[in-house]
Regions:
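Low-complexity, intrinsically disordered Gly/Pro/Thr-rich segments
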Residues: 194-203
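A residue-level signal for beta-strand positions that form part of recognition/binding surfaces
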Residues: 156-158, 195
Length: 221
């Protein structure tokens, strides 16, 4: 995969709430180990976070920006090499697990989803809309937007995101947002108790207007 810097990407300068960065580092250290994460952070000039991760607050505390997040994820992709896809899926899932455990109140599922009375297809849509609402509320706290919406076909939902932190300031010849793919997978499992296939089918890093994830309406198991 060929990855370069995308200059003048307005998304790159969006403010990043500290907790997002913290959860990502907590996920990556599970795969890389402490020494590996330290080396990775040093390689992108962010060694100040190697021992003391960012705050766990859903606020902009450390003046992190989206391009800081994407630098770390792209560096991890390089370190992981041929196993980058699986490792980033896994890291994204672990990050989402931390998010739901620590700040699940930001992602309140509707009552019919919690009671499991609704059909599974509707549960998936409700889950995705709950995520967008939660992320949008967090973005508003930071004084910016979270430009996302859901599209539906017979067999799939499509999660569109114009303000993706994973590929902010990045240009590539393939989709690069496997970390968020894993995050979506784990979030859906947390909401519904089921595993769903999530595949990124469009990416801002490839010149698309939005990153798009295709999500099956039907579980794997």
């Amino acid at each position: 995969m060929n990855i370069t810097t995308r200059f003048n990407d307005p998304i790159a300068e969006y403010k990043l709430v500290d907790a997002y960065f913290r959860w990502a580092l907590m996920a990556l250290v599970e795969v890389l180990g402490e020494n590996g994460l330290d080396l990775l952070l040093r390689s992108v000039g962010m060694e100040r976070y190697s021992q003391v991760y960012a705050s766990d607050k859903l606020e902009v505390v450390s003046n992190l920006e989206y391009h800081d997040f994407s630098k770390v994820i792209m560096a991890a992709m390089e370190v992981f090499g041929q196993s980058s896809r699986n490792n980033l899926y896994y890291s994204g899932r672990v990050s989402a697990r931390h998010a739901m455990r620590k700040n699940g109140e930001m992602f309140h599922p509707p009552e019919n989803l919690r009671s499991r009375r609704s059909q599974l297809e509707q549960q998936v849509r409700d889950s995705l809309e709950t995520l967008i609402e939660g992320y949008s509320n967090i973005a508003r706290r930071a004084g910016q937007g979270y430009n996302a919406w859901i599209e539906e076909t017979d067999k799939h939902y499509y999660y569109h995101l114009e303000s993706c932190a994973i590929c902010a300031g990045v240009s590539a010849n393939e989709p690069v947002c496997m970390f968020f793919s894993g995050s979506l997978m784990e979030s859906l499992r947390w909401f519904t108790g089921k595993q769903f296939e999530v595949v990124e089918v469009a990416c801002r890093a490839n010149g698309d207007l939005a990153c798009v994830w295709q999500i099956s309406k039907y579980p794997k198991d």
